[in-house]
Amino acid sequence: MIIPAFDLINGRTVRLYQGDYSNQKNYNVNLFNSLEVYKSKGIEIVHLVDLDGAKNSANRQIELLKKIVSHTTVPVQVGGGIRTTKDISTLLDLGVKRVVIGSSIVSNKKQVKQWLNFYGPDAIVLALDVHVDSSNKKEISIDGWQKKTNFILEEIIEYFLSSGLKHVLCTDISRDGTLLGPNFKLYKEICSNFKNINFQASGGVASLQDIIFLKKTGVKSIIIGRSLLEKKFTIEEAVKCWQRES
């Protein structure tokens, strides 16, 4: 499915280039109108990133998220600095459909396993930001991509499989926000290796052709942010393109 994405700072829709807060672009969009339009076009879930919460969990945009959930009918998954059980419970209690866990996957692996077991695999999305090197080694980066780790993508997925892991959002960080096109090879490999995981592809989608090629890799969803905001194509075109390839 197509998952439209909004990155939010102080209630505004923005895009960061390569995760850099000092390199942000503002978009003059009415978030609430957009969500209703997306719902009417058949969108089943929207991806929201709370960039204030990602930077400092004390600044989480709870009131905005509460308003979004109560005023719109399209389900949302929310990411951005979710690091504690309280963070997860607060969001799920608001009515958020899924929470997206990032850096804790590496820094707090056992706790994340407990969350998967407690909240269930449908409520949790693991966000894996990877840097693929010249030898095809897929290294995980954390903390807004500032920090490389020694963890490898495949090892992390294997670790969480026993807890029923179902949803993985995978981003090739060299592509995100660039409109350079996705890393098709990466998605084809991981979909082939982990057939029971619902992969969400993210980063670099610039054209309808990218959607066609991504669908063929085996991903279950494509997250699209900048291309929709900058009207590279319409949501109707994206949805039709996905359905046509089904």
Curated annotation (Swiss-Prot):
CDD domains to which the protein is assigned, alphabetical: HisA
Species for this entry: Buchnera aphidicola subsp. Acyrthosiphon pisum (strain Tuc7)
Protein family (similarity comment): Belongs to the HisA/HisF family.
Gene3D superfamilies on file: Aldolase class I
Annotated metabolic or biological route of this protein: Amino-acid biosynthesis; L-histidine biosynthesis; L-histidine from 5-phospho-alpha-D-ribose 1-diphosphate: step 4/9
Protein name: 1-(5-phosphoribosyl)-5-[(5-phosphoribosylamino)methylideneamino] imidazole-4-carboxamide isomerase
Gene name for this UniProt entry: hisA
Active site: D7, D129
PANTHER family from the UniProt entry: 1-(5-PHOSPHORIBOSYL)-5-[(5-PHOSPHORIBOSYLAMINO)METHYLIDENEAMINO] IMIDAZOLE-4-CARBOXAMIDE ISOMERASE
Catalytic activity from the UniProt record: 1-(5-phospho-beta-D-ribosyl)-5-[(5-phospho-beta-D-ribosylamino)methylideneamino]imidazole-4-carboxamide = 5-[(5-phospho-1-deoxy-D-ribulos-1-ylimino)methylamino]-1-(5-phospho-beta-D-ribosyl)imidazole-4-carboxamide
